[in-house]
Amino acid sequence: MSPDDAKSAADGTSVPENGTAPKLSRKPSQKLPRGPPPLFDHLPDATADACDTFQVINDCLYGSKNMGSSDHDALDCDCAEEWHDGQNHACGEDSDCINRATKIECVSGDCNCGEGCENQRFQRKQYANVSVIKTEKKGFGLRTDADLQANDFVFEYVGEVINEPTFRNRTVKYDKEGIKHFYFMSLTKSEFVDATKKGNLGRFCNHSCNPNCYVDKWVVGDKLRMGIFATRAIRAGEELVFNYNVDRYGADPQPCYCGESNCVGFIGGKTQTERATKLPLATIEALGIDDGDSWDTAVAKKPRKKKAHEDDEDYVNSVQPRALDEDGVNKVMATLMQCKEKWIAVKLLSRLQATEDEHLRHRVVRMHGYQILKTTLNTFKDDTNVVLQILDILYQLPRITKNKISDSKVEGAVEPLASAAHEEVALAAKRLLDEWSKLETAYRIPRKKHDHAGPIPGNSFEEERRNKDREEPAKPTDPFANIVIPTGPRSTIPQRNANFFAGQQRPRKPPTNLPAGWFVNTDKTGRYYFYDATGRTQWQRPLTPAIETPKVSAKAQQDQKALQSIIDSLTKEPTPRHSAGHTPQRSTTPATEPKKDKWRSLPLEKQMKIYENTHVVDRFHGKLPKEELKKFAREVNKKLVSSDYKNNRVEDPTSIPPKQAKKVRKYAHDFFDRAVAKYTEHEKKKAHNPSKPTSGVPPGDVASSAATPAKDDVTMSDVEADTSPGSSAGRKRKRDGDDEHDDPAESPGAPPSETPSVKRIKEDDAEGEGEPTTIPPPPTPPPPPADTPPTEEDRSMREQEEALMRENEEAQRLEDEAQAEEGGKGSHEWNGRYHRTCAAGERAVEWRVGNGWCYGDDGHGRAAATTAAAAATAAAGSAGSLKTTLACFAFAPC
């Protein structure tokens, strides 16, 4: 289908016989009924064949290290970490993340949201599941193999980032090579992404007059990157398409094969321009147009006659923008941050300037307002009107403290304007600086340095920051409002010195919510590393739980602890008491953790005696619950040790005389017999009266009532043990040479019944009941990761990038030389949107003057280029005019 046929079918007009271009219609667009989008899931996967036509690269290659720069400082969001199932769900699609709203990706380590948030799609290359298909008329196309939701990330547009001179050279070069399809995308005003020969699958996304995708630019680190996103919900099997938007640059119409009901039959040219001005959807929404359809209708109702200079700016001026709301603030700030066209920036600033809602002004400040306005001020500092707009907006913004102003460094951009030659600019700048000078910098509580080897609490300070804009509920009356409450002791840290922490770098937040069994610590340089209980270390954040050693069954573990408690109590020397007149001395033996199995090194005779006493407890396993048995065993230990020390029976704490061992066995038997009887009686009463509370002692106190010994030398309470006159230090004999068996954790004032071994038993029991995670001591950091040698692919990419840099430098050098030679002669130059017409003969030529170029066409769709001198000669010797033609689908003005 030829362009003429398409036009004839579109508006019912015939093509003139003389071959002149048809007069394109300016009828208002109408919403046509649209059926379900066609599916292409029946077409075979042609990805392998498509990848043979170009070189696949994973990331952009830059013509210089400064190309693709975002011109923005690192901006962090105020979201808090949201860990679920080992994944950080902060900064999601439905969150109120200010970075996501302003099209900035969070960078791990620099943001409050923690590592691995959901606003890192470019960095993680979270592309959609797509495949390449072979279409009937459009060549290769891109198909989604899974359902997509609105705003889902499809693919990053990757290629070679080149400057404008290289871009112009390549358009001519590709045409000479017979390349039919160019893949240029405008990254900035003078930078382009060329995916013609090097790119990824995103280059196969075709054009459509009814697109289901859109192209957007995001700030990722210090670079500006371009991605393709879903406009609406897309079914698996649909072709992914977006609007190429070439008409803004004066391209001649090309046949369009999208097949949509609203297809105008051409890509570019007057047809699309007069039906609707195709600004990016995000820019349209930021300008205050309701949606694409209303925008389409509004601009189509313009008068039929349009002067040659009328363009997007004139159309926008004819449309009344809607009132600014909270969502509109997000879109305005996001578009303003990347805006390089003055007339769009003026419109966006006018919307901010006109708002009087204090809540919306607070929203502007929160959405990185000071940083974005500073960047816009630096971009358009030569335009007095734009500067006055920005200074007025800055003056209107609410200000309580100077913190955000200082953090954004906007003062550095305003201060030079105070001495500007323009009187209004100087007065506005001085007024603003004077207001800022009256503000105080609020003291900020520094972030707490967490114990990285222990559990990491939540970030309550950042949570407070995130919720500061929310309305607080009414607080109840404070009963102590009129009472002066004394404050605590002063800290040695200066509390009101605003500059105390000014020179310190903000500490990075330690990783939180690690998989089970993993812990975090820092090395000497402050770098985090991870370790588990086995001593394994690594630099990378673990994604799976640590491999745990097989655990002993609960029953066996409890039995072992009950037996060990008795063994430890009988083999340890209790803490010696000091008399009132004796000053406790510091132990000269360094504190070391006592060994739990030290009884194994004792003589066999002693081990047998310990086992005899242990066997008594073992006999009652089937008669008492495990927890009660453990508690009774502790009661036996406490009473026996207290009684022996009170009556001076201890001659050697590491051995028990046979006579005393017999008494211990008898007492233990009697104790447990009474305990079993009491427990059985209690259970019977409980069974007969299930709803009536028993008047006796609870099950946990059976030991207290059962422990009524027959002899006075055994009835020993804790109070009596503490007040006994016989508990002097002289009676607590210690054998020389047994220091290795002493418990260094014993305190001089601890009673025998509360020896550290008993305390440790209680801790062990609590550990068995609650199973808290014990934190092992951190091992030494792992060795630094070795610098792996670059792979062959890495070396190849580096060589290609260096070659691209040389190509850009050479093109820029030739451009500068041509400008110096020509000195700006001539009248034909690029005006920012369209090329001026240039005179030509039968064969039009490309004529460059200064920074402007005119693209000629020889009548057969081939671009022609020559030197400036030859172009001038051809132009001077012939007459006529010719519009430019561009073979690629997206350009930016010079």
Swiss-Prot record:
One of its GO terms (cellular component) is chromosome. Residues 582-591 have a biased composition (Polar residues). Residues 462-475, 792-830 have a biased composition (Basic and acidic residues). GO terms for molecular function: histone H3K36 trimethyltransferase activity. Gene3D superfamilies: 2.20.70.10, SET domain (2.170.270.10), Set2, Rpb1 interacting domain (1.10.1740.100). Pfam families: AWS (PF17907), Med26 (PF08711), SET (PF00856), SRI (PF08236), WW (PF00397). It comes from the Eukaryota. Residues 774-788 have a biased composition (Pro residues). Its main location: nucleus. Keywords: Chromosome, Methyltransferase, Nucleus, Repressor, S-adenosyl-L-methionine, Transcription, Transcription regulation, Transferase. Residues 1-44, 447-494, 572-604, 678-830 are annotated as: Disordered. Disulfide bonds: none annotated. It catalyses: L-lysyl(36)-[histone H3] + 3 S-adenosyl-L-methionine = N(6),N(6),N(6)-trimethyl-L-lysyl(36)-[histone H3] + 3 S-adenosyl-L-homocysteine + 3 H(+). One of its GO terms (biological process) is methylation. Residues 72-126 form the AWS domain. Residues 128-245 form the SET domain. Histone methyltransferase that trimethylates histone H3 'Lys-36' forming H3K36me3. Involved in transcription elongation as well as in transcription repression. The AWS and SET domains are necessary for transcription repression. This is Histone-lysine N-methyltransferase, H3 lysine-36 specific. The lineage of its organism: Eukaryota, Fungi, Dikarya, Ascomycota, Pezizomycotina. The gene is SET2.
